Amino acid sequence: MKLTFTKMQGAGNDFVVIDGVTQSVALSTTQLRWLADRRRGVGCDQILLVTPPDDPDAAFRYHVFNADGSRAGQCGNGARCIGRFLREKRLTRQQELLLLTDGDTLALSLSSDGRVFAGLGAPKFTPTDIPFTAESASPQYPIDVRG
């Protein structure tokens, strides 16, 4: 499968951004891992795929895949890159738009000077909301690092 992609970075995170609006995209977990591999693939922290929305109130759906091929709910730096990507690829002329994610719906604001603002909502700290397995909420959590 041949795909057109764009490599982007936002605040130190780097992404492979794929337009699933104008091209058909169906990637397996193995293919996602290969793309993210810094030695054999393109290399990135996450792969971002933008597709048409399945809700008429949203402009696009935004899929986030970690380097291991697993899904992520959303990524703030990735959302800002998606906003810039949508503007530069002329996929939208809107200045305010909603993105559907596997997590919460994100509001993006695209300024005329190229900046992108992502309304990420309030941070969540309750372990079950993140998701994170812990007996209770705590300001710090111990971790057992074996090496």
Per-region residue spans from a language model:
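A glycine-rich beta-to-alpha transition motif near the start of alpha/beta enzyme domains, typified by
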Residues: M1-S112
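ATP-dependent small-molecule kinase catalytic core of the GHMP/sugar-kinase superfamily
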Residues: L91, Q95-G147
